[in-house]
C-alpha cells in the first residue's frame, strides 16, 4: 500500500466521521520543526528538549550545512562528534537518558484511574505483576479465569470486529496514542456498517492473547493495539495485530497482519486508524488475514 492509497483511506474515513483529514505536512515527524541545531555543549541543557535532540557535536565541520540538514532529517544518533576515542559528554548523557526512559516505560504500570477515565472494562492475563510478565511470556498469552467470565458477561457476542487494548511492553504507547487512535478507529468501523464489539483493556497481555479473546467472543476479526518494545529515545510506539477468526489451537503468527511504528514520529495514530478500518473490511471480504490475504 503506497502513500497515496493511505491518504485516500484517511480522507474517506475522516469524511465519513464528519472531520477533515490532516494536511500531509502535519503527519510528518516532529523533528522537521525542531529548534535550530546547536553545537555548544552544556550540562544545563535539558536532555529531553528539542534543542538537545538536534545538538551537533562535531567541532569545526567542513560542511556545517550538510550536518545541519542530516541532523534535522532523522532522530538517529548522528553528528554527535567524539572526544578522542570516546563519545562527547552530552552524547553519552543523552544515550543514558534515552536508555533510562526505555526501561521506565517497560516497568511502569498503566494507572487504574486512567483505564476508568477512558470508560474501559479492565481484565488481565494470568500474570499478577510486572516481574512475572517479563519472565513468563507464556502466561501473558492466556486470560485469567475471572477475565473469561467478565468478557462473557459484559462484552458483545459474535461481533464482526473486536478491538482490544493492552499495555504490552510500553505503557507510554497506550496512554499517549489512545485518544488519537481509538475514537477514529471505532467510528470508522461503525461507519463501515460493521458490528463492533465492546472495546476493553487487557493488563499484562501478549499478542497471542487475542486468539483466546476471539474464540470466547466469537469475533470474526480481532484487532489488538499493544505497546511495542521501546527503543532508545522512542518509547511511545504502538503496534496493531489483526487476525481473522483466531483459534488458540490453530492460529499461528503468519496468520496475523501487523501495523507497527504507530506514533507521532512514525505512522500518525489517526492515519493508522483509517488503515486499520480498511484492513478489517478486506479481512472480512477475503475471510483471511496474514499471509493468506491477497493484495
Swiss-Prot record:
Reaction catalysed by this enzyme: ethanolamine = acetaldehyde + NH4(+)
Role this protein plays: Catalyzes the deamination of various vicinal amino-alcohols to oxo compounds. Allows this organism to utilize ethanolamine as the sole source of nitrogen and carbon in the presence of external vitamin B12.
Keyword set includes Lyase: yes
UniProt-annotated location(s): Bacterial microcompartment
Sequence similarity: Belongs to the EutC family.
Biological process per Gene Ontology, one example term: ethanolamine catabolic process
Pfam families tied to this protein: EutC
The protein, known as: Ethanolamine ammonia-lyase small subunit
Organism: Escherichia coli O157:H7
Gene3D superfamilies with a match to the protein in the record: 6.10.140.690, 6.10.250.2060, Ethanolamine ammonia-lyase light chain (EutC)
InterPro entries listed in its UniProt record: EutC (IPR009246), EutC_C (IPR042251)
Pathway the protein acts in: Amine and polyamine degradation; ethanolamine degradation
Subunit structure and binding partners: The basic unit is a heterodimer which dimerizes to form tetramers. The heterotetramers trimerize; 6 large subunits form a core ring with 6 small subunits projecting outwards.
Listed EC numbers: 4.3.1.7
Source organism phylogeny: Bacteria, Pseudomonadati, Pseudomonadota, Gammaproteobacteria, Enterobacterales
GO cellular component: ethanolamine ammonia-lyase complex; ethanolamine degradation polyhedral organelle
Domain of life: Bacteria
Cofactor(s) needed for function: adenosylcob(III)alamin
Record note on cofactor: Binds between the large and small subunits.
Amino acid at each position: 500500500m503506497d502513500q497515496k492509497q493511505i491518504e485516500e483511506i484517511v480522507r474517506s474515513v475522516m469524511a465519513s466521521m464528519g472531520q477533515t483529514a490532516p494536511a500531509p505536512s502535519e503527519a510528518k515527524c516532529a523533528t522537521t520543526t525542531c529548534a535550530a541545531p546547536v553545537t555548544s555543549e552544556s550540562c544545563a541543557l535539558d536532555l529531553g528538549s528539542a534543542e538537545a535532540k538536534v545538538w551537533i557535536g562535531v567541532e569545526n565541520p567542513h560542511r556545517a550545512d550538510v550536518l545541519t540538514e542530516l541532523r534535522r532529517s532523522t532522530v538517529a544518533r548522528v553528528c554527535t562528534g567524539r572526544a578522542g576515542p570516546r563519545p562527547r559528554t552530552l552524547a553519552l548523557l543523552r544515550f543514558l537518558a534515552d536508555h533510562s526512559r526505555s526501561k521506565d516505560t517497560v516497568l511502569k504500570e498503566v494507572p487504574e484511574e486512567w483505564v476508568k477515565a477512558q470508560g474501559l472494562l479492565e481484565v488481565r492475563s494470568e500474570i499478577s505483576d510486572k516481574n512475572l510478565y517479563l519472565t513468563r511470556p507464556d502466561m501473558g498469552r492466556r486470560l485469567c479465569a475471572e477475565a473469561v467470565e467478565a468478557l462473557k458477561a459484559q462484552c458483545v457476542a459474535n461481533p464482526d470486529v473486536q478491538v482490544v487494548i493492552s499495555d504490552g511492553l510500553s505503557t507510554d504507547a497506550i496512554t499517549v496514542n489512545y485518544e488519537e487512535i481509538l475514537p477514529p478507529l471505532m467510528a470508522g468501523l461503525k461507519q463501515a456498517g460493521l458490528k463492533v464489539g465492546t472495546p476493553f483493556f487487557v493488563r499484562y497481555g501478549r499478542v497471542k492473547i487475542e486468539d483466546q479473546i476471539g474464540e470466547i467472543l466469537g469475533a470474526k476479526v480481532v484487532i489488538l493495539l499493544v505497546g511495542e518494545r521501546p527503543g532508545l529515545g522512542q518509547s511511545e510506539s504502538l503496534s496493531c495485530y489483526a487476525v481473522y477468526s483466531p483459534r488458540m489451537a490453530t492460529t499461528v503468527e503468519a496468520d496475523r497482519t501487523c501495523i507497527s511504528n504507530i506514533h507521532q514520529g512514525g505512522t500518525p495514530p489517526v492515519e493508522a486508524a483509517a488503515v486499520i478500518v480498511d484492513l478489517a473490511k478486506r479481512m472480512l471480504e477475503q475471510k483471511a488475514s496474514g499471509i493468506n490475504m491477497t493484495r
